[in-house]
């Protein structure tokens, strides 16, 4: 299912045993391969980057380990989280959750549409221009309203991987953007 959803997408993976195989497949498809949390794995297999959660290694430390040329993203739930990631020179921010999701345990407070509007407005006011990716419980029908808030990207792993045809679900979502 993961391979069927690769076309035209970025993929964030947490499963170490299949990382090398997925990296090769991502290269074939021209997809970006970001590993969740595992900085040493990113370095070892030369993945495109790492996504760091709120309790993970600081961005600056990951940058020291990886060096330049790797994407380093971080998780945020508040404007204070975003300010910190901006100071640490993150390349992008995964911000959420939008709503309850089954793909992540121990969720931070839900943001909803108004939360994203407020965060995007505050980022603009403060001159923080990091790409902001909405994440957490997002379904196909949420995409237009979320994009209207000013977020730069939307993570939709559940909506894609649980679809009868992940490839078609991804294609439909790409066509909406």
Q: Regions from the language model: what does each represent?
A:
Residues 30-32, 40, 49, 57-59:
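Histidine- and aromatic-rich ligand-binding microenvironments
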Residues 22, 36, 82, 95, ...:
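Conserved PRPP/pyrophosphate-binding segment of the phosphoribosyltransferase/PRPP-pathway fold
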Residues 1-8, 12-13:
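Single conserved hydrophobic/aromatic residue that forms the stacking wall/gate
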Residues 35-48, 77-89, 128, 132-134, ...:
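Catalytic cores of alpha/beta
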Residues 17-35, 54, 62-77, 109-133, ...:
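Alpha-helix-loop-beta-strand connector modules within alpha/beta enzyme cores
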Residues 5, 21-25, 84, 145, ...:
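Alpha-helical scaffold elements within enzyme catalytic domains, especially in hydrolases
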Residues 9, 54-62, 94-107, 143, ...:
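Glycine-rich phosphate-binding active-site loops on the catalytic face of alpha/beta enzymes
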């Amino acid at each position: 299912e993961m391979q069927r959803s690769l076309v035209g997408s970025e993929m964030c993976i947490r499963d170490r045993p299949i990382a090398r195989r997925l990296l090769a497949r991502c290269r074939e498809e021209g997809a970006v391969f970001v590993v969740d949390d595992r900085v040493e794995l990113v370095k070892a297999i030369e993945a495109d980057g790492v996504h760091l959660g709120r309790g993970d290694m600081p961005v600056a430390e990951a940058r020291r380990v990886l060096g330049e040329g790797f994407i380093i993203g971080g998780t945020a739930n508040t404007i204070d989280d975003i300010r910190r990631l901006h100071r640490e020179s993150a390349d992008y921010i995964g911000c959420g959750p939008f709503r309850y999701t089954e793909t992540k345990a121990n969720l931070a407070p839900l943001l909803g549409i108004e939360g994203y509007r407020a965060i995007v407005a505050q980022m603009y006011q403060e001159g923080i221009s990091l790409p902001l990716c909405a994440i957490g419980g997002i379904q196909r029908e949420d995409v237009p309203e979320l994009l209207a808030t000013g977020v730069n990207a939307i993570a939709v792993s559940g909506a894609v991987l649980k679809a009868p045809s992940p490839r078609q679900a991804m294609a439909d979502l790409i066509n909406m953007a």
